[in-house]
Amino acid sequence: MEVSFSSAFKKRIKGNADLEMKFWQKLEQFTAAPFDPSLKTHKLSGKLKELWSFSVDYDERILFYFTEDEKAVFVDIGSHDEVY
């Protein structure tokens, strides 16, 4: 699966070496199988109903959406409390 990153996403991940390392590991897994059960990929509801989320680790999440041509655009990354 092809992915792209919003400018806000790039800013959030830049400068956090630990989070960035975890992210690149999960990105490889996501591009191979976006709905792998270990990622816990799920559709959001409420004010974020247009977005999806998957887990980087116990507390860190990535928010993204699918485009019409089946690409994923990552829009936010952070702790559960930061992104929801």
Pin down the residues of each PLM region:
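Alpha-helical structural elements of signaling/regulatory helical domains
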Residues: 15-19, 36
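A short, surface-exposed loop/turn module that caps and links secondary-structure elements
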Residues: 29-54
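Enriched for short, Lys/Arg-rich terminal
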Residues: 2-4, 11, 18, 55-84
